[in-house]
Amino acid sequence: MPKIIEAIYENGVFKPLQKVDLKEGEKIRILLKKIDVEKFIMAKLPEEKIRELERRFEDENLY
């Protein structure tokens, strides 16, 4: 059954923001959808992490 999770892409790797129920080496299919930083605020991430994400998005011209 499909499941939606949020992840951050760092150094060529997608890092999930919550626990995933997968076995090591299990192959999955990923559908990418960019989200607004505002949604991270609603998730109550520390302000420092939010600012770090904003800087990263600006550096990558994703804003």
From Swiss-Prot:
Pfam families cross-referenced by the UniProt entry: AF2212-like
Domain of life: Archaea
InterPro entries: AF2212-like (IPR008203), AF2212-like_dom_sf (IPR024069)
Keywords from the named record: Toxin-antitoxin system
Regions annotated as coiled coil: none
TM stretches of this protein: none
Family: Belongs to the UPF0165 family.
Known role: Possibly the antitoxin component of a type II toxin-antitoxin (TA) system.
Protein name per UniProt: Putative antitoxin AF_1084
Lineage: Archaea, Methanobacteriati, Methanobacteriota, Archaeoglobi, Archaeoglobales
